[in-house]
Design a protein with these regions (language model features):
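Long C-terminal interaction/binding lobes of large macromolecular proteins
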Residues: 10, 129-141, 145-199
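Extended interfacial segments that mediate partner engagement and assembly in macromolecular machines
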Residues: 26, 75-144
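Cys/His-rich Zn2+-binding cysteine-cluster or related metal-binding knuckle/ribbon modules and their
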Residues: 2-8, 17, 30-92
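Signal for well-folded cores of large energy- and translation-related assemblies
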Residues: 16, 34, 49, 74-75, ...
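Alpha-helical structural signal
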Residues: 12, 27-30
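Catalytic cores of large soluble enzymes that bind and process phosphate-bearing ligands
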Residues: 3, 36, 40, 116-120, ...
Length: 199
């Protein structure tokens, strides 16, 4: 991109590093940023820096929070006897949109993926086992994506939790194989939660 100033090229390159953003989208975003007022651009930059500094993991669910417990773990209205295990925080948002699930969550921050050199020790599995071992949990719902890695992760966790007296279920397949929770509509997620099965 020799025809763009170096600072603009750098901005385009940074946007292009984001998942799902190709070269043309990165250019569009960069040009939009240039059209912002100085105050708007500063507000945008400050929001990125603030989110990076303040957003951490909930000490219980490993969901995202800006300090202390996440709102779901802090809510007395949630059923603490049921844990829904998801790959990442976007899946929490997707399931919450269904308004069907009233339990708590556990965010793994990924799935077991030998191809990507991600093993069980790279995920929030130990903290899940510790939660279940502490007692008071009746059911663990495996809500990882219905693709090869999601299935392998769910099966691994089911075996790991077998020694505990806890029911382990898997979301029903209203979600297509190879699909991702964050893209599922509310009705599909509701059916998947209602039709979960023991594994």
């Amino acid at each position: 991109m020799e025809y763009f100033p170096a600072a603009l090229e750098k901005l385009v390159e940074q946007f292009a590093r984001l998942p799902g953003i190709g070269g043309k989208s990165a250019q569009r975003l960069a040009f939009h940023v240039l059209s912002l007022t100085d105050a708007e651009a500063q507000e945008f930059a400050d929001a990125i820096v603030e989110a990076k500094k303040k957003v951490t993991c909930c000490p219980i669910s490993r969901n995202l929070t800006d300090g202390g417990l996440c709102p779901i773990c802090a809510s007395p209205k949630r059923d603490e006897r049921v844990i829904c295990v998801v790959a990442d925080a976007r899946d929490v948002a997707a399931l919450e949109r269904s308004r069907e699930y009233t339990g708590r969550y556990h965010v793994l921050h990924g799935v077991i993926s030998p191809m990507n050199h991600v093993g069980p020790d790279d995920l929030e599995i130990k903290s899940l086992v510790e939660r279940v071992a502490a007692g008071g949990i009746d059911e663990v719902i495996m809500a990882t994506n219905p693709d090869t890695e999601g299935e392998a992760t769910a099966m691994y966790l089911a075996r790991l939790l077998r020694p505990f007296s806890v029911k382990v279920t898997r979301l029903a397949y209203g979600i297509p194989v190879g699909g991702h929770l964050e893209f599922a509509d509310d009705a599909t997620l509701m059916r998947a939660l209602e039709g979960r099965r023991e594994i």
